């Protein structure tokens, strides 16, 4: 199996909510590696996010998503009466329109078998064998993936890669602690027009 396993992903509307956002739900301008990893697990029907620890992902943006802001009703139950007006408040949320990107998968350092790369290969070759549920989303359950398909690139082609950079302005999670924030792991990035190189790969790990 080839080490380079590229997929083209298209999502009409998405919000990659910043981890520290509260009343105003700001979005990251690009999908974080942790979010893309979750989508790939869902694609193959895997519910254990630890199953493919060690996989490496490389993400390249093909579009510059348009940002907009919507207002919606956010409910939290402070009063027993569900219709009490104090249980609802306006919630502003940023949305991205037309998110298109490439994700390359490298399972050479995974320990479990079959690897995520092998399972994705099987999902596209024999989709009837995949046991999964729900729509395929990128982030929130509302943000359905419109298309995910095999893609062909060469290692010397230039794309706008999400590149690790200690001075980068994008701080994104590659592993999320859903119980609290203490276990969430971060990496700094910048978008760089380049060919595939070691700095564009992010390994999914818990440390």
Predicted regions and their residues:
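Solvent-exposed loop and beta-edge segments used for protein-protein assembly and interaction
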Residues: 1, 51-53, 95-97
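N-terminal, Lys/Arg- and Ser/Thr-rich interaction peptides
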Residues: 1-21
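Internal, well-folded beta-alpha domain core
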Residues: 64-207
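Glycine/small-residue-rich interface belts in oligomeric ring/scaffold proteins
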Residues: 20-82
């Amino acid at each position: 199996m080839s080490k380079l396993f590229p997929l083209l992903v298209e999502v009409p509307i998405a919000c990659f909510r910043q981890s520290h956002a509260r009343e105003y739900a700001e979005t990251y301008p690009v999908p974080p590696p942790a979010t893309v990893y979750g989508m790939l697990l869902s694609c193959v029907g895997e519910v254990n996010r630890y199953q493919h620890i060690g996989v490496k992902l490389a993400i390249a943006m093909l579009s510059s998503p348009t940002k907009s802001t919507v207002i919606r009703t956010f409910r939290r139950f402070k009063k027993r009466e569900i219709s009490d007006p104090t249980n609802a408040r306006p919630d502003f949320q940023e949305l991205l329109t037309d998110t298109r990107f490439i994700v390359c998968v490298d399972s050479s350092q995974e320990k479990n078998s079959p690897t995520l790369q092998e399972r994705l290969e099987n999902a596209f070759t024999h989709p009837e064998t995949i046991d999964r549920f729900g729509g395929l989303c990128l982030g929130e359950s509302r943000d359905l993936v419109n298309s995910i398909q095999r893609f062909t690139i060469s290692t010397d082609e230039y794309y706008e890669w999400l590149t690790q950079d200690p001075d980068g302005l994008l701080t994104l999670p590659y592993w999320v602690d859903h119980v609290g924030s203490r276990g969430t792991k971060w990496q700094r990035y910048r978008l760089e027009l380049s060919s595939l190189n070691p700095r564009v790969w992010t390994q999914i790990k818990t440390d």
